[in-house]
Amino acid sequence: MSDYEFTLRFQLQDENDNPENYLDLLFEAGCDDALVGVGSLGSISLNFTREALTASAAVTSAIQNVLSAIPSAILIELAPDLMNTTEIADIISDRFQKLTRQAVRKYATGQIARAKTRFPPAAISGSQPLWHLGEVLDWMVINEKISKPSVISKVNRLVETTQTIKIFNTAIQQNTDVPDDLLAAAKEIIISQTIHR
C-alpha cells in the first residue's frame, strides 16, 4: 500500500452553510486522514493523505467517506491537476527536488535543448497557461530531469493520482458520473504507464 495525496473540494447545499458544522461527521465517516479547509461558507476542502493500493481506490474511498458524512455535498474539483509554471515548480520542489519557476518556463517554451521529447502542450493556453501536472511529471522523468530511483517511485505515485484526478475532473466538467468502464480503462492505462517507466 502507498500514500496518495490529493484535495477534494465540495460545494455545500446552502451557500451560507458553515463547513465547521461537519468536522465531527467527517472524522466519524473516516476522513481522519485529511486536513479540512473551512475558510469559506458554503464550501469545504479536504486535503487527504490516504493509504490505498491504488490512487483510484484512495480517491473513490475519500469521496464516499465525505458523501456519507455530507450526503448533499457536490464534488466540484479534485487537485492537483491543472497548474501553472509556478505551481508546478512549487509542488516538485516541495515533494521531490529543487526546481525553479524559470526552469519550468524554459522547459515549456523549448528554451532547453537537452530534451528527448517535447514538453507537453498546455491544457489551457492564454496569458497564464495551465498544464496537467501528470503530463509534466511524466515528461520530467522521460527527459531525466528527475532521475533518482527513490524520487521516481514517489513521482510515479503522484502521476497515478493526477491521472485519476483528471478523469474525475473531466466527468465533473461534463456533469456526468465516472463510468465504471472509464475507471477500469484508466487503471489499465496507469498500470501500463507505470510498467513502461
For the regions a language model picked out, list residue spans one by one:
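A short, Lys/Arg-enriched interface patch at domain edges and termini
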Residues: 133-191
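Short, low-order "capping/linker" segments at domain edges
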Residues: 53-60, 84-101
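A short, structured beta-strand/loop element
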Residues: 19-43
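Conserved short beta-strand edge segments in small beta-sheet-based binding/regulatory domains
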Residues: 33-39, 64-81
